Amino acid sequence: MASLIQVRDLLALRGRMEATQISHTLHAPQPMIDAMLNQLEIMGKAVRIPEEPDGCLSGSCKSCPEGKACLREWWALR
């Protein structure tokens, strides 16, 4: 079972990661990693980095049927 310290250490080693990458690396369920990242954010230890929509190749994310699912969210230590 992953701990907050393991999530923090992984972010320290890798710089920035997506929650799904952290989940796969630590072999932990995605909802648990999401909760841990939110807790680290509340504690002021981690920061959420949303991907900018200007990276969209077609430029039509607002009308995209995926609903901006192509935009990724990164996490990094503060």
Swiss-Prot record:
Pfam families: FeoC
Keywords of the record: DNA-binding, Iron, Iron-sulfur, Metal-binding, Repressor, Transcription, Transcription regulation
Residues annotated as binding iron-sulfur cluster: 56, 61, 64, 70
Superkingdom, taxonomy of origin: Bacteria
Alphabetized InterPro entries for the sequence: FeoC, Tscrpt_reg_HTH_FeoC, WH-like_DNA-bd_sf, WH_DNA-bd_sf
Record SUPFAM superfamilies: Winged helix' DNA-binding domain (SSF46785)
GO MF entry, a single one: iron ion binding
Record's function text: May function as a transcriptional regulator that controls feoABC expression.
Family: Belongs to the FeoC family.
Protein name: Probable [Fe-S]-dependent transcriptional repressor
Origin organism lineage: Bacteria, Pseudomonadati, Pseudomonadota, Gammaproteobacteria, Enterobacterales
